């Protein structure tokens, strides 16, 4: 009988962890809908139809939009 108490505690902890993990049990998707990952956000860009004159296009975003990154400008006086 003393073995059953740690067994039930272990099962309870595992069930709580499975509920709290994002992927669910064995990486299966839960009922929560996640937004698709946009690689443009990794570089702190923004998805637009056209880039501004101070921006450069680096990647492509979903729906055929452009990933616009701010062009690093260093003004030096000569």
Swiss-Prot record:
Keywords: Antibiotic, Antimicrobial, Defensin, Disulfide bond, Secreted, Signal. GO terms for cellular component: extracellular region. InterPro entries: Beta_defensin_dom. Disulfide bonds join 40-67, 47-61, 51-68. The keyword Cell division does not apply. One of its GO terms (biological process) is defense response to bacterium. It is found in: Secreted. Residues 1-23 form the signal peptide. Has antibacterial activity. Belongs to the beta-defensin family. This is Beta-defensin 29. It comes from Rattus norvegicus. The gene is Defb29.
């Amino acid at each position: 009988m003393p073995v059953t108490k740690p067994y039930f505690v272990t099962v309870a902890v595992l069930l709580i962890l499975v509920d709290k993990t994002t992927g669910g049990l064995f990486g299966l998707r839960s009922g929560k809908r996640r937004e698709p990952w946009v690689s443009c956000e990794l570089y702190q860009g923004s998805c637009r139809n056209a880039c501004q004159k101070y921006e450069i296009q680096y990647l492509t975003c979903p729906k055929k939009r452009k990933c616009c990154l701010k062009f690093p400008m260093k003004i030096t006086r000569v």
